[in-house]
């Protein structure tokens, strides 16, 4: 069964969350329970709790960065859920990218700000709509997971060409805007957009690009950390966790491709 989401409003509904599809069906609280807590291996559960625990420790020692910490926690939930092929990743993603856009603005990382505000925010809605049409039962039939697929060699070449052209143009624009790190910022933004498109289209190779993006973004926030102090530390650690998750995401999506090939 596939589910849709027309609203994120949850307050005032004590027993059941009603999120209607066009067909008139609803998404129950029981569905959310299965989606959020079902289908995890022991390793994945420990993996997620470890990531969240690290962010909690950072917040305890650096409470002034609470906004960045919330962005980091919801971002971690988002990418881990993407790695599992869970459609609920888009709820956490919406919260994270909205906050991250504001934090990026305060650090004058305008490329990151525009990427999150103008691309990632609307993409959460587009991605949910695209994924809901291509969901299948998971390995244990306990939860749903997205039907993943793989790029051909020709498609890979097109992805690389588009990334190179887009990066060259965007870096020039960031120079004119006075971005703090136009080259690094520009490469990160363009490759991120391409990776996001591959994610929406359910391609496994998004994770190869996310690995590149996360390495670049770690460099970007490391510079911000040295210049501006501890307020950027939660986001720096968030991208270190993203990098680890990207490797695991590629491995897990390879399994999804094999499991749902031909469907």
UniProtKB/Swiss-Prot annotation:
Q: Record's InterPro entries?
A: NMN_transpt_PnuC (IPR006419)
Task: Note the Pfam families from the entry.
Answer: NMN_transporter
Q: What is its main location?
A: membrane
Q: Could you tell me the superkingdom of the organism this chain comes from?
A: Bacteria
MF annotations from Gene Ontology? identical protein binding; nicotinamide riboside transmembrane transporter activity
Chloroplast recorded as keyword: no
> Where is this gene product found?
Cell inner membrane
Q: Which keywords does the record carry?
A: Cell inner membrane, Cell membrane, Membrane, NAD, Transmembrane, Transmembrane helix, Transport
- Cytoplasmic compartment ranges equal 1-40, 84-86, 132-155, 202-205, 254-263
Q: Which residues lie on this side of the membrane: Periplasmic?
A: 62, 108-109, 178-180, 227-232
According to the record, the segments passing through the membrane are 41-61, 63-83, 87-107, 110-131, 156-177, 181-201, 206-226, 233-253
Q: How does it sit in the membrane?
A: Multi-pass membrane protein
The keyword Transmembrane helix appears for this protein? yes
Q: Which residues bind beta-nicotinamide D-riboside?
A: 124, 196, 210, 214, 242
Q: Name one GO cellular component term.
A: membrane
| One GO BP annotation of this record | protein homotrimerization
UniProt function note: Required for nicotinamide riboside transport across the inner membrane.
UniProt subunit comment: Homotrimer.
Q: Would you identify the family this protein belongs to, as annotated?
A: Belongs to the nicotinamide ribonucleoside (NR) uptake permease (TC 4.B.1) family.
Instruction: Tell me what this protein is called.
Output: Nicotinamide riboside transporter PnuC
Origin organism is Neisseria mucosa (strain ATCC 25996 / DSM 4631 / NCTC 10774 / M26)
Q: What is the lineage of its organism?
A: Bacteria, Pseudomonadati, Pseudomonadota, Betaproteobacteria, Neisseriales
Gene that this sequence comes from: pnuC
């Amino acid at each position: 069964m596939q589910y849709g989401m027309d609203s994120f409003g949850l307050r005032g509904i004590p027993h059941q969350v009603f999120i209607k599809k066009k067909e008139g069906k609803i998404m129950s609280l029981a569905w959310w329970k299965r989606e959020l807590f079902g289908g995890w291996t022991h390793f994945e559960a420990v993996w997620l709790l470890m990531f969240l625990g690290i962010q909690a420790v950072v917040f305890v020692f650096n409470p002034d960065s609470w906004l960045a910490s919330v962005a980091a926690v919801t971002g971690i939930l988002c990418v881990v859920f993407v790695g599992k092929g869970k459609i609920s990743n888009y709820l956490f993603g919406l919260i994270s990218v909205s906050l991250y856009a504001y934090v990026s603005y305060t650090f004058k990382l305008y490329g990151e700000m525009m990427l999150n505000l103008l691309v990632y925010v609307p993409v959460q809605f587009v991605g949910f709509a695209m994924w809901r049409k291509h969901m299948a039962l998971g390995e244990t039939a306990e939860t749903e997971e997205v039907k993943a697929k793989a790029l051909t060699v020709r498609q890979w070449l097109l992805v690389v060409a588009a990334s190179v052209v887009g990066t060259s143009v965007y870096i020039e624009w960031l120079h004119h805007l006075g971005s703090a790190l136009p080259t690094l910022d520009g490469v990160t933004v363009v490759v991120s957009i391409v990776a996001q498109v591959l994610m929406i289209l359910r391609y496994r190779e998004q994770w190869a690009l996310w690995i590149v993006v996360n390495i670049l973004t770690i460099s970007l926030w490391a510079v911000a950390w040295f210049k501006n102090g501890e307020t950027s530390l939660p986001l720096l650690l968030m991208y270190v966790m993203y990098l680890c998750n990207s490797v695991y995401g590629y491995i897990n999506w390879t399994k999804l491709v094999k499991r749902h090939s031909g469907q």
